[in-house]
Amino acid sequence: MTNLSQSDHSAAPAPVVVWSKPENERSGSPLLVMLHGHMANEEDLMGILDFLPDEFTVASVRAPVAQGQGFTWFPLMQDAAYSVDKVTDAVQDVLDWVDSIKEPHSSVTLLGFSMGMAVASSMLRARPADYAAVVGLSGFVVPTDGSTLFHDSELENQRVPFFWGRDQEDPVIPGDRIEFTHAWLNRHTKLTKVLYAGMYHSINAQELGHVREFLQMVVPGVSRTPLSR
């Protein structure tokens, strides 16, 4: 595992990123960009690497705003400071960074947990043709609220494979947000939705096994080798 802090790009400094492979081993591999949840950091999701197909180069990205003992992508939706512009500002910065590093890779896939799923789905809405697949874990999709960054009608025609795993008893994501997310994903993506009882607002081994199988099925160049543990 190697740490990398990229140099400045366009209008914003590039994020702090943890990579699964050194730079000289990344060329030609599919890229998986991981986006953590609220008040976490770029190391938070690296514990799932052993479950992911070996072909991927994984880049786990730190959110831009320090909060508590971690970082956040944008204010919580129930906070007065929240706006869709705060979401799209964060999303645009990650889009710009991905543009700067994606060239050596065969494809780009996104994986987001909780608020990270909101960022991942927003990136997909901004660039419907850019991603092989998206994985959303215990998360949600944000309402458009008139943002010109999102191209939902174009995305409807793309039908990008999207895995959404969650627990119906998740105590963190409100029910109205889940209802919106479910309807939006059904309309705009090729959705694989799986429920996991007793997981609450987290990730478990069964879900990660399903994520592995999903990625093996939908991302070109990823072999269907079984998980050896």
Predicted regions and their residues:
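Acidic catalytic loop of the alpha/beta-hydrolase fold
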Residues: P143, Q168-I173, H201-S202
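Short beta-strand/loop motif that positions the catalytic acidic residue
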Residues: Q158, F163-R166, D170
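Gly/Ala-rich beta-loop-alpha elbow adjacent to hydrolase catalytic centers
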Residues: L111-G116, A120
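C-terminal catalytic histidine-bearing segment of alpha/beta-hydrolase fold enzymes
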Residues: D176-R229
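A conserved short beta-strand
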Residues: A129-V142
